[in-house]
Amino acid sequence: MGHQQSSMNPSRGDSHGDRHRHYDAGVSGPTSASDQDPYASRNGRGGRRNLVAAIVGGGSNNEVPERKETAAERQLRRLERERIARIEERERSIKEEHVDGGYLVTMGVYTGPEDFNKAIVRQLMIERRVAPFWRGLDDYQDDWTEHQLVAAGRGLPIPAADEVPAEDIAGPHSPDSANVSSSNLQNLMVPLASRTQSASYDTSLSLSPSHPAFSTPSSVPPLNAPTTSTSLLRPRSKTLGLRSSAKEPPAPDPAPREIQLPRDTQVNGQAIEAFLYKDAVECSICLIWYPPYLNRTRCCDQSICSECFVQIKRPEPHTPEHHGPPPIASENAEDTEMLVSEPAACPYCQRPEFGVTYEPPPFRRGLVYAKPSPEVANFSSAMSSSSSINSPPLTSSGLAAPRGDRRRATSLSANDSHVITTDRIRPDWSAKLEAANLRKAKKNAAASALHAAAFVLPGTSENRTYTFGRSRFGRNNRSDNSAEASGTATPPNRDASSRAVIESSGHARREDQDPNATRRMRRDDLEELMMAEAIRLSIAAEEERKKKANKEAAKEAVKQAKKQAKEDKKKEKKERKSIYGANGNSASSSMLNLGSSIAATFTGRRRGDSTASHLAIEVTPEEVEVPVQGKGKGVDRPSLANQGSSTDNGLPSGQHSDPSTSSSLLETHQSVTSPASPDKLSHIREMSTVSSAASSLVESGNGTNAQGSSTSIENPGTNGASSEGNEDGDSGTESMFNFQSLTALIEKEDDNEKTHSADHVENAHEASDSRHGSRDENASQDMDVSMETIRPADSPARVDNIDRNHSSTTGLQMLDTEIDTSIITPQLTITPETPAVMNPTEENGKQLGSSFTSRTNAEITQ
């Protein structure tokens, strides 16, 4: 044991000692995993530790699951990779590849997407059937020198004309250009590993010994010479491939092989850029200057650069409406719904099937095909120039033999072998059109399915019962045989179900045989159903409109009936109140106004109310100046009873001409001018019945009853009852012939006469409908005021003989009453202030009753 421990301890101590020695020596520790991990020697414990670490690590990873990339993100990444690859390829191609001084990639004139086939465009440019992408010049001067043209062609800043050109611009061709061209030839041509030896050998034999492709240095092996590695250590697979290829015919060449011609930067002793740009032309579309070797349109022989040519393409697939002649109606209606895409038109003459031809420069530089296709070998452009390597023998300067330069006199067909159309560089236009038609067909089918699902087509339930299984047949049989389905367990009729299955199977078989007919039938049924539904909706809408119109008409009729009933009710109510209505311009209203004025004469109270909206002056006995007792003498006026009521002198009233009182009252109350006679006061001259009212008043004083007229002649709104208004102008109505109050007032006047007092009443023009009014501006100048004094019964002048002949013209019937006339016969005394009586002509119609035609024969004596 002790020996074992000693043997173990030294080993452990040695291990520690070695470890310490390694650390002390400055050398890194052991590199093996077992030396680094002390648990590595213990498999069980170390495995458990690793297992725990794996579980913990896996749990941490599972907590944050990795997000799965979507299809859109993958598409974006793919597009980004392609864009970066295009940029790199563009830079490489500009540095290493060219065709007669032009390039095989676009130069950035247009920034839009390049959706043309780049491989086809590259092939056509190498074959010299389409002009390469020349470097364009924004500006061009005819007097540029050679080194200026070289700088412009290479994209460098244009130096001054007298500036000494740099060596790299106008220097001669470098001696190592052959090595550069040979290295490019090995790098740019198609790899030979993918071709067989026999194919390469046949291709090499097609080249003449004088071809520039064979003018390579001796250090470069021939194209068909195998390398040492392949000759010494050739794999067994290649050996078998060579044996099999010797027996079988060679496979056709998938693509022609590109060859880089010797690099030569000069043509006829001058730089290639100077040779190209010395006669630059401007493209009519992009307005950029290019070498004169541009594409020519096949139709109108106009110049167009390749940058513009590759941008012209067919329009996107669209419906054929409004494009060209109408399509011929075909039996299949679906053909008319197909999308179309017309060929591109010429940008100059707008002729369809746009295509171009190309005349290459007379020299060859850059890339060519080692074995041209038969089409290229026999190709000669429309401008009598060749673009293949089988062209006429080249001169020592590399230029083709000159030929007669002639222009094309006629346009070329779009199918000509020399013409390159826009469809040639975009061969996928037909595939895009088919894809668009397919998408539209799918969309139409989906829309038809949605429409068909929205309606139940007639007759489809019987024809398609087989698709619903056995339960559908059982339901139909139960509906047909209700007696059997009434609770019994009798099985359905097997003959009917089998017949339905046979018919449905036959229908399905016919559908499989003729799907177009079935589809057409379904479309026709759907159209008929949609038409019927449209008609039904139209009829329903029309019925709804008629219902609404009838309802509105009924409402309007009810409304009109209610309105008419309300108007009739109002009219009836007005008729019950007064037989004369509410019109103040009527003859009866004027007669009432006249009666009110006459009544106010006896009562000493005036109420102004005129039909012509003239407001009269109301003068109370307190406002009238009392005359001196004993002035003047009484004069009998018997003519007043005979003159009728032709003038205001025939009325039992007096006038007083107090200028101060009249002017003050006229200033206070200004009347509105009458529309009938704006320069005078309106005295109701159109009312001929006022005189009858005045005569009726006198008749009532001689034995007639005025109570009857007080109830029948009144203002509307009094309801047959008379009421006295206030002197200050209350809106109350009063009777025109209230003789009871008149008798009491006269008795009171008899008492006042004993004390030698007189009441003066103003006889002014008044109206019956207004309490407060104003006189006209000319009333103070045109109206004469008279005063009359009411005397006791011993006065010689009496108002007892008033002509009754005019009473019948008014149509106003006054009832006869018996009253004491001795009380109402006051004495009339004429004062010095009383003016003489004026005839109607002199008065000019200013007094009330001026329209009366009776004559006045009264005379005034003093």
Swiss-Prot record:
| Positions of region (Disordered) | 1-70, 201-261, 380-415, 465-524, 551-591, 605-735, 750-784, 825-862
Q: Does the keyword RNA-binding apply?
A: no
Q: What cellular component terms from Gene Ontology apply here? A: cytoplasm
Keyword terms of this UniProt record: Cytoplasm
Q: Mark out the compositionally biased spans (Low complexity).
A: 380-397, 579-591
Its domain of life reads Eukaryota
**Polar residues biased stretches:** 1-12, 201-218, 465-491, 640-676, 688-724, 847-862
Matching entries from PANTHER family are given as: PROTEIN SIP5
Protein's recorded name: Protein sip5
Q: Which organism is it from?
A: Sclerotinia sclerotiorum (strain ATCC 18683 / 1980 / Ss-1)
Give the gene that encodes this protein.
sip5
